A protein has these predicted regions:
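N-terminal Rossmann-like FAD-binding beta1-loop-alpha1 element of flavoenzymes
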Residues: 50-79
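Glycine-rich loop(s) and the adjacent beta-strand/alpha-helix scaffold that form part
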Residues: 266, 303, 308, 314-364
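Glycine-rich FAD pyrophosphate-binding loop
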Residues: 71-96
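Glycine-rich active-site loop/strand segments that organize a redox cofactor
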Residues: 19, 88-116, 134, 191-194, ...
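Active-site/ligand-binding neighborhood in enzyme catalytic cores
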Residues: 180-283, 287-300, 308, 315, ...
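Active-site rim elements
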Residues: 99-109, 189-199, 248-256, 334-342, ...
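Conserved flavin/dinucleotide-binding core of flavoenzymes
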Residues: 5-7, 13-41, 290, 299, ...
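Mobile amphipathic helical/loop "lid" adjacent to a hydrophobic cofactor/ligand pocket
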Residues: 22-28, 121-122, 129-234, 245-248
Length: 523
């Protein structure tokens, strides 16, 4: 996840009760297939009458989900994973011999993401609440430092230059105010969701807030700073709106003991040897009713191997898919979609500390924020034995992440310690002594994902959303970039379920149209 990860999360919006949000607008972003897919996740697709060989490229949540469904249906499945672990953009950082851990990728699950919760439950894992907001945390903007609770009570404390009609409103309230025109179009003009989505697909987030939302530049800056939107203001407004609606959920959860347990449980549920790690797929050759996949192995005496299957599912990121050599080449439209879709950058900086110094401020969970390079600081919801603690000392996206990625690790830690000291009003040297261990993850530099999560720029929804999910002959595609909303484990799972269902439908259709040929080929 970001995956979808990660949860990967796209905005850090202050809590907005979903009951306060326009229900018609929320419905525009609901997937009409979702409940059917939830039943598929629970019951599977049944036993296939014709067993096929299927290769899945990529052992992230999309690939593992599809592999599990197809495996349970009776197909012979092989999963090729280029890296040395499963999970993709689910990555839990652990250190041998210690009990603490922290998420470098996906780290939260919205309460409405029932598919993810279903797979967590079926894997025998537990959930606990992830606290996104805490009134005791700090906000440091424009040289002014206040606790979140004080800013909620008086948003003008932060000193943004806004119009009189925008004063004493939170960034969240200002963003919601900008949506009035869309809400009116849905309710008064009887515009369809598709009409609204098509109309506003051309707007960047900043363009919409100024031209349609009629907000002042000061209000736009406030939204960008506090809601983590400024570094991606050039991205599509409809993506920002999708993220805003999700972050209005009443509750988020995390997997007790670490998110990496989920993909590992899916992998363990497959037959031994199904998932091949350190197996980088290089080429996909379609020939008649067969698909041949050539991949690298870890065996120096046989550096490359070849598998033949009836179907192939490409469950990598769009960027990683471009490294595959397809023969015959993919359609020009597919190539354009894979090449053009925008990915966010995302960076996380982890500090492990001998003492949970943030608890001196009565901070347990939640996040602090600043306009400094560190941007967002997340405090752990899980407590480990003793006084030790681990903190996500910086979480940045888009241009903020690119800034971090240009620095070497030591310089990054120095920059983050500067911001952490300012936010907590402590000396940098004290924090350096308290937090001697660090780790840095740049998803934009990851050689396997090659990016954080997909996030459309203007026009990309209309241009690429359907094309990204369209199969090419016997080659299918899955991943959080293939479905909506981008950047979530749930979306990766959803795309994997849809792909598995489509492959099974193709098997059924072939067996109906040409039963003798199907029977012979499947042997």
């Amino acid at each position: 996840m970001f995956p979808g990860w990660l949860a990967l999360t796209l905005l850090s919006v202050a809590c907005l009760g979903t009951q306060d949000f326009n229900e018609e607008l929320k419905k525009c972003f609901e997937d009409p297939q979702y409940e059917d897919l939830l039943q598929l996740a629970r019951n599977g697709i049944g036993q296939t009458s014709v067993k096929k060989k299927i290769i899945v490229i990529g052992a992230g949540m999309a690939g593992l989900t599809a592999a599990k469904i197809l495996h349970d249906a009776g197909h012979q499945v092989t999963v090729l994973e280029a890296s040395g672990r499963v999970g993709g953009r689910i990555e839990t950082h652990r250190v041998a011999g210690v009990t603490w851990f922290i998420e470098l990728g996906a780290m939260r699950i919205p309460i409405s993401h029932n598919l993810t919760q279903e797979f967590v439950k079926r894997s025998g894992l537990d959930l606990q609440e992830f606290y996104s907001n805490n009134d005791q945390t700090w906000m440091l903007f424009n040289g002014v430092r206040h606790q979140l609770g004080d800013v909620k009570a008086n948003p003008d404390r932060l000193g943004y230059s806004v119009r009189d009609d925008e004063k004493n409103k939170t960034a969240d309230q200002l963003f919601k105010q900008s949506l009035r025109k869309i809400e009116k179009e849905l309710t008064n003009c009887k515009c369809s969701c598709r009409q609204v989505l098509e109309k506003y697909d051309s707007f960047s987030t900043k363009e919409y807030l100024i031209k349609v939302g009629n907000l002042s530049r000061g209000a736009v800056q406030m939204i960008g700073d506090l809601l983590n939107a400024d570094s991606g203001y050039y991205e599509a407004f409809m993506e920002t709106l999708r993220a805003y609606i999700i972050f209005g959920e009443s509750r988020f959860d995390e997997i007790t003991g670490g998110f990496d347990q989920l993909p590992q449980a899916l992998s363990d549920a497959l037959c031994p040897g199904t998932v091949k790690l350190h197996s980088l797929a290089e080429s996909v050759e379609m020939s008649g009713d067969c698909v041949h996949v050539t991949y690298r192995t870890s065996d120096p005496l046989q550096p490359r191997a070849r598998l033949t299957a009836d179907f192939v599912l490409v469950a990598t990121t769009a960027k990683a898919a471009r490294l595959l050599r397809f023969q015959p080449p993919l359609s020009l439209d597919k190539q354009d979609a894979l090449r053009s879709i925008h990915y966010t950058s995302a960076s996380k900086v982890v500090l492990a500390c001998t003492r949970r110094f943030w608890e001196d401020d009565s901070i347990f969970g939640g996040k602090s924020s600043t306009d400094g390079p560190a941007r967002f600081i997340y405090y752990p919801n899980q407590r480990f034995s003793g006084d030790k603690g681990v903190i996500l000392a910086s979480y940045t996206l888009d241009d903020d992440s690119t800034f971090m990625a240009a620095l070497d690790r030591d310089r990054i830690v120095e920059v983050v310690l500067d911001d952490l000291a300012a936010v907590h009003n402590r000396s940098k040297e004290e924090l350096r002594a308290l937090c001697p261990y660090s780790n840095v993850k740049h998803w934009g530099l990851d050689p396997y994902s090659m990016g954080g999560v997909a996030f459309f720029t203007p026009y990309q929804y209309m241009d690429y959303a359907q094309e990204l999910s369209r199969p090419e002959g016997r080659v299918y595609f899955a991943g959080e970039h293939v479905d909506l909303p981008h950047g979530w484990i749930d979306t990766a799972i959803k795309s994997g379920l849809k792909a598995a269902k489509s492959i099974q439908e193709a098997v059924n259709l072939a067996s109906t149209e040409n039963p003798e040929h199907t029977k012979e080929h499947s042997s």
